[in-house]
A protein has these predicted regions:
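Thiotemplate assembly-line natural product biosynthesis machinery
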Residues: 1-23, 76-81
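Phosphopantetheine carrier-protein modules
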Residues: 18-37, 54-64
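Catalytic nucleophile serine of serine hydrolases
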Residues: 40
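Conserved catalytic core of two-component sensor histidine kinases
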Residues: 44
Length: 81
């Protein structure tokens, strides 16, 4: 897996599917949950996407605001496997 590819595909998923705005210029360090852009239920969708798109299973106890609030954090978690 290439980090840049993971970032691009995850960003597209978040913007298009969760934010309903494919053109949104999401910053890598922009807080999504604490910033009120997505809710905790969206984390489950991100977990399913990570498994489907990258073959990476993220356990429920890792799908937390502390671990997955920004695009950077999400990419780091996916890259960790």
């Amino acid at each position: 897996m290439d980090r840049d590819d993971v970032r691009a595909r995850l960003k597209e998923f978040v913007c298009k599917t969760l934010l309903n705005n494919a053109a949104y210029a999401l910053a890598d360090d922009e807080p999504l949950i604490t910033g009120g852009m997505i809710d905790s239920f969206s984390l489950a969708q991100i977990g399913v996407f990570a498994e489907d798109a990258f073959g990476v299973y993220i356990p429920d106890n890792d799908l937390t605001v502390a671990n997955m609030d920004t695009l950077d954090q999400m990419v780091n978690r996916i890259m960790a496997g």
